[in-house]
């Protein structure tokens, strides 16, 4: 799976599972803050999704990879087996 496919899969997850409006969600949109408004519970769902769909563990990582779809995708790419 290339990085564009990873980003598309992540965006679909944010829209379907977390209820994020796709019209305001771009790959570089900040996920935690006023615009999207995800919270710590959502971060647990993101961790679970990444682990089960990409076989990459995000458990115990800092908040940097969670900034946007771009940063989550980059984390996945750099930690693939």
Indicate residue ranges for each PLM-predicted region.
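Phosphopantetheine-dependent thiolation modules in NRPS/PKS and related acyl-activating systems
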Residues: 2-37, 46-48, 52-81
């Amino acid at each position: 799976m290339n990085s564009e496919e990873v980003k598309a899969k992540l965006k679909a997850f944010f829209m379907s599972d977390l209820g994020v409006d796709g019209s305001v969600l771009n790959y570089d949109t900040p996920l935690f803050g006023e615009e999207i408004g995800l919270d710590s519970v959502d971060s647990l769902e993101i961790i679970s999704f990444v682990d089960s769909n990409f076989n990459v563990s995000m458990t115990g990582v800092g908040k940097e990879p969670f900034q946007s779809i771009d940063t989550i995708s980059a984390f996945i790419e750099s930690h693939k087996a």
